[in-house]
Each structure stands twice: as C-alpha cells, then as structure tokens.
C-alpha cells in the first residue's frame, strides 16, 4: 500500500480535509475583471442586450409624462366646463391612452429581449467555464486530489458555477436597466422642475453610503457561505460513499456531529449574509420615502404658485417613486455581485491550480518496447519536506517479474505510481528502454503499461464497455479471450444478459472479487509490454486467487511485470523480490535466496504462515 503523506487536516468519515469558511474574498476587482474577460467572446450579443435595455427604458420613462398630460387635460377640461368655456376632450385623451399603451408594450418587448440576450450570454459563459474546468481536471496532478476533497471539487463544478451564472445574469440585467432608468428618470425630472429634482436627489448620498457599508460587511459572509456549502456537500458525498463503513464502526454519532458542525457553519454564514442583504431594501426604501414626502410638499407649493401644472405633480411623483426603485435594485445587484465574486473566485482558484509538468517538446516515439526498466537514485515525497522513497535504485531486465513486498507504508505502491508518472520525482530518474520517462508523453508512457489496482474501479455501463476501456478498438472475440484469461468468462455467462449486463453506480450489483476479476481482464485486453499488479489478488478468495494466478502467470510471460502483494505465497516464482521498509530497499533476491539469508523477508514470510 502507498505510504502517501496525508495532509494535516482531518480526513475520512469524521473529518473532511477541506478549508474552513469565513475567509474574505481576496480580490473582488481582479475576480470581476477575469469574469468579464469571459464575456468578450459574446460582446456583440452583450452590447445588443444593453442597447435593448436602453431603448426599453427610454420608451418607458416617457410614460409618466404622458400620464401627467392626461391628468392635466382632464383637470383643465373640468375647470373649463365649470367656467362654461368648454369641457373635457375625450377624443384627445383616448388617443393619448392608446399611445401610452403602445409605449408600454414596446418597452416590455425590448425588456424581454434584453433579458433573453443577457441570459444567453451568462449561460454561454457558464458553459465555457465548465468546459475549461473539465479540461483542467485532466491536467491536474494527483497531488491536487490528495489535498482537496472530492466534495469540494464537485461543489466548484456545480454550486459555484450555477451561483455564478444565475447571480451574474440577474445582477447584470438589473444593473444595466437600473442605470439607464436613473439617467432617464433624472432627465425627465429636470424637465419638470429642477427644484423638485434637487429635493429628490438629497436621498441618493444617504442610499449610496448605506449600500457601501452593507456591501463591505456582507462580502466576506457570502464567501464563507459558498465555502461552507462545499464542506456540507463534501461530507454528504463521503458519508454516502462510506455509509457501510460508518455503520460497521458505529460512527453514526460522530458523523452526525461533524455534519452538525458543518451545517452550523453554513447556517451562520448564510443568515449573516442574508440578514445584511435583507437590510438594504427596507433601509433604502425608508430613505426613499422620506424624500418622497418632501417632493410631495414642494410640488404642492409650486403648483399653487403656478410654476408647474397639476399633471406634472403626478408625473414627478411617479418619477420619484420609480427613481428610488433602480437605486434599490442596484444595491441588490451589488449584493448579488458579492455572491458572484465569491463563487467566481473559487472557480478561478481551481482553474489557476498548478498543472502537471508540461510534456516534452519532441517526445520519444515508442515502437518496439522491450520493457527494460531502470530506477536510478530515485527520491520522492508527497510532501517535499518528508521523503518517503530514499535513493531507490533498481535495474529490471525485459520480461522479468519483479515483486515488491514490505509492510504497510513501506512505499511499494508509490514506486509503481512514479513509474506511471502520476507524480514527479524529487530527485533521480526512471528509464524505460534507456529513455527517461520524461522523454515520453504521459499518454504514450501509460499506453506501455497495464495496471490493476487494489481498488477495483469500474464505470457505470455494460461489462463489455468496461472491459473495452482497456482497448477501445477491441473486437468482441478479443474481449471474450481476455475474460477467459482472467477466468471471469464463466461468471459473465451466468448473468442474465452476459456481457451486456449493466453495472450500476459503484458496481454494487456484483461482488468485490468479481469486480477485481473484471479489472484484471481489462488489463489483459490492453496487452501491455509492462504490467503492474498492485495487490491484484487481495480482494478475492483463495479459490479465485488460484484461478487468476494461472492466468496472470500466462499473461506475464515475455512482459516486464511488477507485482505488489501482501500474500507472499503468490510471488514465490518472481525473478526478483525487492523488500522495502520505510522507503528503503532492505533486501533484493529471489524467494529462495532471501529465505536463506534469514533476514527481513524471512520474518515477513514466516509471520504470514504463523498467522495462517
């Protein structure tokens, strides 16, 4: 087993190994700048959306003025009728009402078009982000997944991107419309009375100060909310995957306690952020209503002195009421942008994660791989400050079977992971056929090597599809031959649908031993020149082990093979046995040679039979 260093954070069923909440957004402006770079490819659609918003608002702001004209016409007509000088011109009023209806209909149409276009931009941006994240995850080293929980990574892919898309769509649409509305209303208000406009504008500085204070306070809570959501998702995901283990070890109480802690973190950050965001609307409305009262008093005074018409009062009151609304909407949009920035920051952190070392410019082309493997002074540590493989050197001839044995944590699995270049070396080199493995592309290197891990991983899909994963171009006959070599063909035929049997998620509809046999068959099908069997028989019973051991013996003929096994009886016929302890080679030789030395290997071997 690998002695991979675990980070200091708790992991496993009772610990998540994730970052805590409460962290303030590091760079709001920088994050938003990066975000808007993703809008550039859709800038034409974005600009058309803004234009639609401008047109919609420009048409809409005329409405209250026309309503005021209708009221003025009615008031003047009524006064004329009282004075005996005529009456109300209903034909003119009907035409004005029809014009008003047409104006509002056009404004609604442009507003809908603007919302549709903005929604398209934000969703395309979300699509692009998910695409880049999916490409990024294939470029990340395994060390990234050692340090970050699956739940947190999943939360970045789903919750954070969804939050980003939805909040950005709503905030952008609302903010563009609100800014244009403020300008339009201000122009119309000034056209009626600069004095009343000045009275109405008194409330703006108060509202802006309030918005800035609340936004500053709420920003860190929105970031904490997103991160706490990642904690909760990660814990639930792990509990679902390991629910049997949790129950077996009576860990329900600790699991519930951990969930309660994470849920409390989410609750605390969520209610604080929502409390602050909820304050903005009522407080800005209160300030707006105070200004509204002042406008009404001043408007009445100006009407009495003949400076404005009666209908202008109604128009201005409508503008005043509507003028405070976009200010409130902008404050809410700023609030949503905090949520956008918090989610975007986590997404960009993922996209900015350090990738695997770049591929070599002119890679070695492998044609006739012999399978000669050389480890030369290899040093490695999952944490650079804690070396787990110490100056490891070994030469393996083509076609040799090399067993790597040792107690748990000795570094056995680490060695083969380094051969596969899952991790980069701290020092030293590994060669295949005389070429440093860094001279090959990673895909080319891994095409040379077939690997069967202790954890038998199969995908949701048919057995045939899972076996073909080792060689997508394989024919049905080749798949069947590989299954026969792994002694799993008989089992497959006992299933109702044979090779077309669909494995469910986590392949729980077959046993662990059967899953292991299928992964071995998958490696057979790949027909690699170098074979790695990492505890390949550890999950099968003795009878099944005997069957697949025969198949593996046939498979390993003519191939360079690395076998990692706890059951030392399975590697007695290996050409070389490397005995490791704490990252060091303590003994090398054949089974008989090592037994004669009566050293560390002999103690391991005898200990197993004493246990048996």
Locations of the language-model features?
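ABC-type nucleotide-binding domain
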Residues: 352, 359-360, 366-612
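Transmembrane helix-loop-helix hairpins at lipid-water interfaces of multipass membrane proteins
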Residues: 2, 46-110, 190-195, 306-310
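Cytosolic ends of transmembrane helices, especially the final helix of ABC transmembrane type-1 domains
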Residues: 119, 228, 251, 275, ...
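An intracellular "coupling" helix at the cytosolic face of ABC transporter transmembrane type-1 domains
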Residues: 41, 142-143, 161-168, 172, ...
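Juxtamembrane loop-to-helix connectors within ABC transporter transmembrane domains
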Residues: 21, 31, 39, 118, ...
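Transmembrane helices of ABC transporter permease
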Residues: 45-58, 69, 170-224, 295-308, ...
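Hydrophobic alpha-helical segments in the permease module
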Residues: 100-107, 111, 204-212, 277-291, ...
């Amino acid at each position: 087993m690998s002695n991979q260093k675990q980070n200091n954070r708790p992991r496993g069923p009772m610990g998540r190994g994730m970052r805590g909440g409460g962290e303030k957004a590091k760079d709001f402006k920088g994050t938003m700048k990066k975000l808007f770079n993703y809008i550039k490819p859709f800038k034409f659609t974005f600009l058309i959306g803004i234009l639609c918003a401008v047109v919609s608002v420009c048409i809409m702001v005329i409405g209250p003025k026309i309503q005021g004209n209708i009221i003025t016409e009615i008031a003047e007509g009524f006064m004329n009728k009282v004075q005996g000088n005529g009456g109300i011109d209903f034909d003119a009023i009907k035409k004005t009402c029809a014009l008003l209806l047409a104006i509002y209909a056009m404004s609604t149409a442009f507003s809908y078009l603007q919302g549709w276009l903005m929604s398209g931009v934000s969703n395309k941006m979300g699509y692009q982000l998910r695409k880049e994240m999916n490409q990024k995850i294939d470029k990340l080293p395994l060390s990234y997944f050692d340090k970050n929980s699956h739940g947190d990574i999943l939360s970045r892919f789903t919750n954070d991107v969804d939050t980003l898309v939805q909040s950005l769509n709503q905030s952008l649409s609302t903010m563009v419309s609100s800014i244009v509305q403020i300008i339009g209303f201000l122009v119309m208000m000034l056209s009626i009375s600069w004095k009343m406009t000045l009275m109405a504008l008194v409330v703006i500085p108060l509202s802006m100060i309030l918005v800035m204070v609340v936004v500053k306070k709420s920003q860190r809570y929105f970031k904490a909310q997103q991160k706490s959501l990642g904690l909760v998702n990660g814990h639930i995901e792990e509990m679902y995957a390991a629910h049997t283990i949790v129950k077996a070890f009576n860990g329900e109480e600790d699991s519930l306690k951990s969930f309660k802690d994470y849920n409390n973190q989410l609750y605390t950050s969520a209610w604080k952020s929502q409390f602050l965001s909820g304050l903005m609307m009522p407080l800005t409305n209160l300030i707006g209503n105070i200004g509204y009262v002042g406008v009404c008093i001043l408007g009445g005074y100006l009407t009495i002195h003949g400076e404005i018409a009666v209908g202008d009062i109604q128009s201005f009151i409508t503008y005043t009421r509507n003028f405070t609304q976009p200010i409130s909407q902008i404050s809410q949009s700023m609030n949503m942008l905090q949520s956008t920035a918090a989610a975007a920051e986590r997404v960009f952190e993922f996209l900015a994660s350090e990738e695997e070392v770049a591929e070599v410019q002119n890679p070695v082309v492998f044609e006739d791989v012999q399978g000669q493997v050389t480890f030369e002074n290899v040093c490695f540590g999952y944490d650079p400050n804690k070396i787990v493989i110490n100056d490891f050197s070994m030469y393996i001839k083509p076609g040799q079977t090399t067993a790597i044995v040792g107690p748990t944590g000795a570094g056995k699995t680490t060695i083969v992971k380094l051969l596969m270049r899952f991790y980069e070396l701290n020092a030293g080199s590994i060669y295949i056929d005389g070429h440093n493995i860094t001279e090959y592309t990673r895909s080319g290197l891994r095409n040379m090597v077939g690997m069967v891990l202790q954890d038998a991983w199969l995908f949701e899909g048919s057995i045939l599809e899972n076996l073909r994963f080792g060689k997508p171009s394989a024919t049905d006959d080749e798949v069947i031959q590989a299954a026969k070599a792994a002694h799993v063909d008989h089992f497959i035929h006992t299933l109702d649908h044979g090779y077309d049997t669909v494995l469910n998620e986590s392949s729980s509809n077959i046993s662990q031993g059967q899953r292991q046999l299928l992964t071995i068959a998958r490696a057979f099908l790949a027909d690699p020149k170098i074979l790695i069997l990492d505890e390949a028989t550890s999950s099968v019973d003795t009878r099944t082990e005997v069957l697949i051991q025969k198949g593996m013996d046939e498979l390993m003929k003519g191939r360079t093979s690395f076998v990692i096994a706890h059951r030392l009886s399975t590697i007695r016929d290996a050409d070389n046995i490397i005995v490791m302890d704490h990252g060091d080679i303590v003994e090398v030789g054949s089974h008989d040679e090592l037994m004669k030395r009566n050293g560390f290997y002999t103690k391991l071997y005898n200990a197993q039979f004493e246990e048996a």
